[in-house]
Amino acid sequence: MDSDTSPNPFASSPPSSPSPRPSLPPPVPRKPSSLVSAASGSPPPTHRASFPDPARHPKMGATVPGPKPKTGYCCSIDKDISAGEQVHIVDALKTTEGGTASYITYVIRLGTHTVRRRYSAFLSLHQSLTGLYPVLIIPPIPSKQSLTDYAVKGQSKAREDATIIARRKRLLEDFLQRLIRHPILGGEHVLHRFLEEDVSWSEVLHSPPISLLSKNPLHAPSHNPTFQPTTPTSPSEAPATTSYIAHHLLPTPSPSHPLRQPDQRFMDSEAFTEKFQSHFSGTMEKVNRRVTKRWGERAHDMSELGGIWNGFSLVEQGKLGDAIEKVGRAVDAEYLATAALLQSWEKTTTEPLHIYSQFATLIRARLSFRHQKHVQYELVQEALETQRDKLEILENAEREARRLEEALERGGSVLASPQLEPEAARDERERAQRRARASQGFGLLSAVKHSLSGMIDMDPEATRRANIAKTRDNISQLEDSYQAAAQDLKYASMTLQADLDRFQRQKVADLREMAINLSQVHRDWCKQNLEAWKAAQAAVREIDPHPNRPAQTQTQVQSQQSHAGPSTLHAQTEDDVSKLGVDAMKNEIERVEIEIADKPLPKPSLAETGGDGVVPSPQPRQENDTEEQEGHGPLGPL
């Protein structure tokens, strides 16, 4: 890995999060927790220590209380989940219950419980959990059908496509499995009711706690979004009502609003999530689609090639025809193995990559929500400082007016006001600068308003006192909102960081499993092809050898096979064929040389002997040869 790679901010846990634990043995039944979930009052699993406890009151001020503790399991579904039961979607059925149009329902099984839910119920469950837990990472669900599918296939065929239904079954099952394994979401009673048979999901959606959710999650407590005020019957219940009002008075900032003092830890998390999303969505998914497309094209070509070989086998007879048929079968087997590889590839690689691309989008939404909570805190803090400065100015003016009034009553002597001390003057300048920043863009309007109010006001003293009272009321409300925003920001930061730590450990385990599954898919593909081509090789060896090449003995073939390993068998076979051709050529040359050596040399003719039967000896070359003296060689002039 490159040295300039930024560190992973998800790996740094806050003090409330424990260090990653080693792999645990199979789940064992757990005892019910005395804590309850923040939304519906159902007990979460016991291993939720890394998350802040919403049942505890925060240290600063009296705010919205958390859920009340309870004992025991809330239902049989909760007990089965605690015992380690797994959830599965075992079937998808076409039905017309409750209407005239047909739709697909998915059969969910958890232990002995079986229930049928349609896709819209899964979608509403995801939306409900997102509202109940605005700072937790809710697992994604498969997206709806695209408009292109409806346009090409039609509405009914797109819904009933077997490939789409099978993919949805796997992705929806993954969604439910991630929910029940979550340390907080697994104890949510809304999820239990979704998995419980004979429960109308429509009634669940229109009953508490889902019906108590606020339309704007920024105006609700992060740790208890379903909190509703009641008429206080005792002084201890009054702060809860006050905090409820304070939450609804909080501003609604934009997600792009800048922060004056951002948290560096979450800035790193946002940058890491953006790179994580870009890497999965823009790089890995794109390359994965290209690779699977090429594998699919190769499978199509192998299908055509297998048909050609099988057709050719009908033309030939005997051992050659059998060998050609076996080669065609091997090609067909490779086509089938590639098709199986693509199916397994989609389950083990394509779908997990898409799930984590969706996870990146969901994490960015949770980080954006926490960012808005931080902006709320800073805006309320700034407004509170402005109102306090305004109150101080009004109170100073009131004291100055009273001092002048008392001086006039004592004798009309007007005392000069003492000069401000250097520190007081500096504080006054800072307050003036803050007021200028707060009223930036409204300077002319404020001046005109102040002038008009001065001309119209008939009793400035009463107006000033009314402004003081109104400012004090505003400060009181802002202090309540400031406490509520501070509590929300603290809980959102701690909970989101703890869930990011949990997600990081889960991501590492999932990517490891994905890599192992991908290697196993390729291994199985290679095994199937090897078996098919071994059968074809055995059939090819039964064909008679080439007439121009010496045939190998059975002993030579067996010795070569025994010394050759599986990985080098194919390469050695090609080398043997080439060596056989060279050896045959050498043998032919040696045979011709032997025949020539055994034949007697022919006798010289009369022309060569000069008529006397004696072959003349060659004349030696003269050193002073005329041609050489003239500069001529045997090939011409030099």
Swiss-Prot record:
Biased amino acid composition, Low complexity: 1-14, 225-239, 552-562
Disulfide bonds: none
InterPro entries in the cross-refs: AH/BAR_dom_sf (IPR027267), PX_dom (IPR001683), PX_dom_sf (IPR036871), PX_Snx41/Atg20 (IPR044106), Sorting_Nexin_Autophagy (IPR051079)
An annotated GO cellular component: phagophore assembly site
Pfam families for this protein: PX
Positions of region (Disordered): 1-69, 215-239, 408-432, 545-638
Residue ranges with Pro residues bias: 15-30
Record key words, sorted: Autophagy, Endosome, Lipid-binding, Membrane, Protein transport, Transport
Membrane topology note: Peripheral membrane protein
Function statement: May be required for cytoplasm to vacuole transport (Cvt) and pexophagy.
Name of the protein in question: Sorting nexin-41
Biological source species: Cryptococcus neoformans var. neoformans serotype D (strain JEC21 / ATCC MYA-565) (Filobasidiella neoformans)
